Swiss-Prot record:
GO terms for molecular function: ATP binding; phosphoribosylamine-glycine ligase activity; phosphoribosylformylglycinamidine cyclo-ligase activity. Its main location: cytoplasm. This is Phosphoribosylformylglycinamidine cyclo-ligase. GO terms for biological process: 'de novo' IMP biosynthetic process; adenine biosynthetic process. The gene is purM. It catalyses: 2-formamido-N(1)-(5-O-phospho-beta-D-ribosyl)acetamidine + ATP = 5-amino-1-(5-phospho-beta-D-ribosyl)imidazole + ADP + phosphate + H(+). Belongs to the AIR synthase family. It is found in: Cytoplasm. It is an enzyme of class 6 (ligase). CDD domains: PurM. The keyword Electron transport does not apply. Pfam families: AIRS, AIRS_C.
Amino acid sequence: MSGNNSSLSYKDAGVDIDAGNALVDRIKGAVKRTRRPEVMGGIGGFGALCELPTKYKQPVLVSGTDGVGTKLRLALDMNKHDTIGIDLVAMCVNDLIVQGAEPLFFLDYYATGKLDVDTAADVVSGIADGCVQAGCALIGGETAEMPGMYEGEDYDVAGFCVGVVEKEDVIDGTKVAAGDALIAVGSSGPHSNGYSLIRKILEVSGADKNEELAGRTIGEHLLEPTKIYIKSALKMIEKHDIHAISHITGGGFWENIPRVLPEGTKAVIDGNSWEWPIIFKWLQEKGNVETHEMYRTFNCGVGLVVALPKDQADAAVALLKEEGENAWVIGEIAQAEANEEQVEIN
């Protein structure tokens, strides 16, 4: 028995169960607005239940998990937490749509050194916003208060999503062939990738996040939420013979496009077919970043690259524009020689 007669509690160790319960009460409304008819029960159980939609004959489940990287540090520095949850959902669901999957449900993990209920509620509200945009249900999550693991009220988030696609409709890149057209679907900014380089550029250049650029502050440009493509992409998939979709995330063009290309093919991109959004021009100038490195780190204004038959490209672009997307023909698929790079940007 310790010489100290005072009784210790979990709260004395830095874990506030009451704060956790208060957070659950705060987020119930946000969770409710994401509900889908397939969801069984509410939050708070040991597991979350979800039926498969009855319209699928041979349903295939598609799963994904992701985070938002060091964009979180920027959100913490700017004390703005209500959109980072949208980023989290986007990074997960956009990875599902590349295989043609409709997102069904989403779960989140929120870890912090000291739970601030207001901050966590803002994050979860953003997650709910993202789920509404994606059409998936927020069915559960975990909040972990871990004193000594994180500095103060710093936090990290991770997301987990499951979607469904008809077995015969899985998009896996096997149909990609020379002569296919490539369509770009525009991004909303850097999305959630390249933020370690972005923060280094801010540090080295001494740039002020409150500096104005095209009517918005640099900070606002950089915290712009990742675009969620689910509803527009599902309509495109329904109407057109989509051969492959690449989500341009970490690794940029060079790493992500080859992931969906069969051996012996390459993507030939017309670098003059679009103008980089101003935030990318600013980052390149302030950081003196080479163009190749820009394409390797950032999406440079392109969130998705879609391969489809050439004779369907114009109609697909028109459909995407009707759905509010910025879309254009960005290139084509060509034959590649052995050991040749699978992405060529002219």
